[in-house]
From Swiss-Prot:
Disulfide bonds join 40-46. Keywords: Amphibian defense peptide, Antibiotic, Antimicrobial, Disulfide bond, Inflammatory response, Mast cell degranulation, Secreted. It comes from Lithobates sevosus. Expressed by the skin glands. This is Esculentin-1SEb. Its main location: secreted. GO terms for biological process: defense response to Gram-negative bacterium; defense response to Gram-positive bacterium; histamine secretion by mast cell; positive regulation of mast cell degranulation. GO terms for cellular component: extracellular region.
Length: 46
């Protein structure tokens, strides 16, 4: 019925938010690691 439809939408948007946040966190972590690697390559300290 109407309630289950609304509930599914809520669950979907909740999951989407979690995935988006997790993706952002993972992306930032990868970016930081990449910057560190590039930095040490420039300095020749890898």
């Amino acid at each position: 019925g109407l309630f289950s439809k609304f509930n599914k939408k809520k669950i979907k948007s909740g999951l989407f938010k979690i995935i988006k946040t997790a993706g952002k966190e993972a992306g930032l972590e990868a970016l930081r690691t990449g910057i560190d690697v590039i930095g040490c390559k420039i300095k020749g300290e890898c």
